[in-house]
Structures are given as C-alpha cells and as structure tokens.
Amino acid sequence: MHRFVLVATGGIFGSLARYVLSGVAQKLTTSSFPYGTVLVNLLGSLLFGLVWGILENRITFAPEARLLLLTGFMGSLTTFSTLTYEGMVLLQSHMWLQAALYIVGQTVAGIMLVWFGAGLGRLV
C-alpha cells in the first residue's frame, strides 16, 4: 500500500504542475496549436532524464524515491495520452504537416532531452 501512496502523491503534484504549465503556455499564444502539451512533454522529458541521471549515478536513493519522482510525478507531468489525442485531432482536421511535426517532433526531441538530462544528472 505504501508504494501506491508514493505514486499517487507524486501523481497529484505532477498533474497539478502539468495543468498550470500547459495552461500558462497556452495562454501566451493565440494559436490553437497545443503548445502547452509540447512544453510539458519536452520539459518533462528533460526533467525525467535529469532525475534519472541523478538517481542512478550520483545519489543513493531508496527505490521509493523512484516511485514518487519518476513514476508518480514525472508520469503525470508528461502527457502522452494528450499528445496522441491532439495528434489525432490535427489529423482529423487534415493538418497533415502539423500533425507529423507535432508527433514526430516531440518524440524525437523528448528522446534527445531524456538523454541530455541523464547526462546532466550524471554531472551533478
């Protein structure tokens, strides 16, 4: 039960962070393009890599820290389900190029940012 509480606690704060960050980012533009989702997915990828790099290489953390930070917080901060839904909406709107850039761009950039964040975390 303790592990579920850790994941849920991290999830509460991660989802609140996603809601605030994506809302602020979306309000800064008049475009209907989902910039808020892009921001949280890319920032989340960078932070995931950073935390992972720190947890794996620099600081000895209990396995519970991984559950709280990576599974709970980071899992609810990033929004793959939202990415796929908004990608589908772009496709249904016949916005082929935007959909491709949205989906492929975030996926490639996310992988690169996890790698960069992990490297950065190893240096900390």
Curated annotation (Swiss-Prot):
**Cross-referenced InterPro entries:** FluC (IPR003691)
Which is an annotated GO molecular function term of this record? fluoride channel activity
Q: What is its main location?
A: membrane
Keyword Kinase assigned to the entry: answer is no
In this chain, Na(+) is annotated as bound at G75, T78
Look up and give the membrane topology term. Multi-pass membrane protein
For this protein, the activity regulation entry reads: Na(+) is not transported, but it plays an essential structural role and its presence is essential for fluoride channel function.
Q: Which UniProt keywords apply?
A: Cell inner membrane, Cell membrane, Ion channel, Ion transport, Membrane, Metal-binding, Sodium, Transmembrane, Transmembrane helix, Transport
Q: Which Pfam families match?
A: CRCB
Q: What are the BP-aspect GO terms?
A: cellular detoxification of fluoride
Catalysed reaction(s) here are: fluoride(in) = fluoride(out)
What's the family?
Answer: Belongs to the fluoride channel Fluc/FEX (TC 1.A.43) family.
Recorded protein name is Fluoride-specific ion channel FluC
Source organism of the structure: Nitratidesulfovibrio vulgaris (strain ATCC 29579 / DSM 644 / CCUG 34227 / NCIMB 8303 / VKM B-1760 / Hildenborough) (Desulfovibrio vulgaris)
